[in-house]
Regions:
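Long, hydrophobic alpha-helical segments
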Residues: 47-51
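Short basic helix-loop element that most often maps to the first helix and adjoining turn
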Residues: 4-26
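Short, charged, amphipathic alpha-helical segments
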Residues: 134-142
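Recognition helix of helix-turn-helix/homeodomain-like DNA-binding domains
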Residues: 26-46, 67-70
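Short, charge-rich amphipathic alpha-helical segments embedded
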Residues: 145-158
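Charged, helix-prone or intrinsically disordered regulatory segments positioned adjacent to compact structured domains
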Residues: 52-131, 160-162
Length: 162
């Protein structure tokens, strides 16, 4: 998903018009909506400083706007393959369902990714149990890692034990 689609998604989520968001970013009123449309359609790509400003106005982390190319299933698959290469993500089967898991023994990076995924799973479980609202869950996701206070990560055994 390109950054323009994420801008569009969060703008609509916040109930903003293109003109409103553009003006909040400091664009002139006459061209604010046109500028935003250019970013949303991908004809222009915001630089880092504008991405940071967009994130602030949209009340999300800049990381929530900048995501890899997952506009197609093939692009998504290659993103997953990269995660397999770099972070030990593995595809497997459990109870007849395809699932993704992290081989925590691969490296320190995979152990850290596992911790982060466990934290995400805990937040999702809290949502499922009704302990937090969808709004709170989305706030947790869209500001990640800012509100990740769990620190209840699984301790990874040393590799020499295997």
């Amino acid at each position: 998903m390109a950054i323009g689609e994420r801008i569009h998604f969060f703008r609509l989520l916040r109930g903003m018009t293109q003109k409103y968001l553009g003006m909040a970013l400091g664009f002139p009123e006459k061209s604010a909506d046109v500028r935003l449309a250019q970013y949303e359609t991908g004809s222009r790509t915001p630089k880092a400083d504008l991405t940071a400003a967009l994130a602030q106005v949209l009340d999300v982390s800049p990381h929530a706007l900048s995501v890899p190319d997952i506009d197609s299933y093939v692009g998504l698959m290659h993103t997953l393959f990269t995660l397999e290469d770099n972070y030990g993500l593995k595809v497997s089967e459990m109870d007849g369902e395809v699932c993704l898991k992290v081989d925590v023994r691969k490296s320190k990076d995979t152990a850290r990714l596992h911790e982060m995924l466990c934290s995400w799973q805990q937040a999702a479980a809290m949502l499922e149990a009704g302990e937090i609202s969808k709004e709170d869950y989305d706030k947790w996701r869209y500001h990640y890692p800012e509100f990740d206070k769990s620190q209840n990560y699984v301790k990874v055994p040393p590799q020499d034990l295997f």
